[in-house]
């Protein structure tokens, strides 16, 4: 996973002023400039207009299941679907804020608030960026309890916790029979009683397991947990986040499974092998510098499989020193036998990935409709590069056509490339159209000209253009077309709903001597300052790639005014019919509200991070955009039916549940902003419900 710095400076007037070093006289003349910008944006909206679909209504048969949201993605299969239908297309316009809860988290130190709450018995459970765990009454938002693990802040480069895992011991009301599990940013796995928030004393030592064991010597902040464990049976499977683009000697990316009752290690697996590791002897460590699993995993209890979206082999942007064994499983989905940790099957979405197109999305498990009218147990994997792969989750075989196509070659000296890459041609892609000089965009004719000149200077040959000293335009950037927000599936209407974004990056390779002189260092206390300084000077993030001949800078491809060099829309929301495998509608997602000059809110579609939630009521809920709204769309037509203002950026996945006490349906989302997106930071969890008379 990459943390892009300064991506969204483009809509901030003060930053534009600072970048251009405008004098007072020039600044007073900016209404003329912004008038030209506004005119250009209005013209650009011709490319971003949306007409709702006229698709026929989808007929729902049978009664709704009991609405539950007990996992990060609603179900263990990550479909982010609620069978609740009290809130529907006819009344969603009557949604209002039911309650707002503040965690009192220090927004200055929080990286991003991404924790989608889970619901158990009418109570909500979530973690703050610094791993403080909260239990709230779902009807009132009042706090039941708080557990603060007091993470070691000196060990944390940034704070993120995407959510909690839940395990219930059948037919038991004992202490910790209902328990929550969380990995922390200082490498611990903690088990809590869901009723009281107290540590489960039977788990590990004082309710926690030390995840740093077996990792060897790890630099501070280079290894931690950002996503919830995957629980299957009586084991919890835990991945890890590893700092990107640092060196060829990063911590192990080992995936480990622990007994949910005792905390005992059940098995450990990494990408160098097909079978789980034998138990380590005292003083031994897992192999370093292996691909990790930083995203959310999915499980199939019936098949006994856990599905891992894998990351890259460090460093992400240079792979010339990787071994064949290291390259076998990265940027893939790997199915492991939950009982043993052995590989059942794998499917690779990018061969020898040097673009940071790792698999960050949670695999979505569905019953996929086949051409003969039957269904197959399937796995849907959205990817950063924009393709979506549909696989038989029993075997890993594609259920829609995948072909290998030639891709650009001629990398830097010492690198090598796969001659082909897999393309999912049997399902709609969310990869951007190829860039060209004529497609360069600007808020004025001047920055459009600058973008055209810059485009001609750089190397760009479409998707999979390799890194270069000339400077490579990578589109989509490693921010992704689709990142960890993944997709939602309405199983009754057989619709896939997905939000995507577009941001090309300019990445420039430098020699070892040059990158050292520019100040690139391993991430740590000094490195954080160096990255910030580099971004402020327009270099973007500086990555050292130690152990290789090179270093690299990575920056969003923006004009001198800070606007994107490519034409809008810059963010989309799309529905795909799984039966016909066609897009039934696609629309711009988000506006420039709060970021454009003169208070203008252009519906250009904007950059977004987060996921969607779909309901039986025919609605798709999504936030994620830079304009700080939660929106509701008609899942069948794409029409926007409602929007609710959030107190901060909603860069997270929403969820919905029905209270067992009052019968009211709620839609809930964290609103804490995202440092890298420049959205308003905060500490809120906001719940919406229908107005009452």
Which residues are covered by each model-predicted region?
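Internal/C-terminal transmembrane anchor helices
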Residues: 21-49, 487
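Mature N-terminal segment immediately following signal peptide/propeptide cleavage
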Residues: 60-104, 574
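Short, solvent-exposed loop/turn elements at domain surfaces
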Residues: 76-83, 105-110, 134, 316-317, ...
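Ser/Thr/Pro/Gly-rich low-complexity linker/stalk segments immediately outside membranes or between
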Residues: 45-64
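Repeat-blade elements of multi-bladed beta-propeller folds
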Residues: 69-73, 110-130, 157-188, 221-247, ...
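Cytosolic-side transmembrane helix boundary signature
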Residues: 2-34
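Segments forming glycine/polar-rich beta-alpha architectures that bind adenosine-containing cofactors
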Residues: 470-504, 509-511
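Extracytoplasmic/lumenal domain signature
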Residues: 91-104, 133-154, 168-173, 189-220, ...
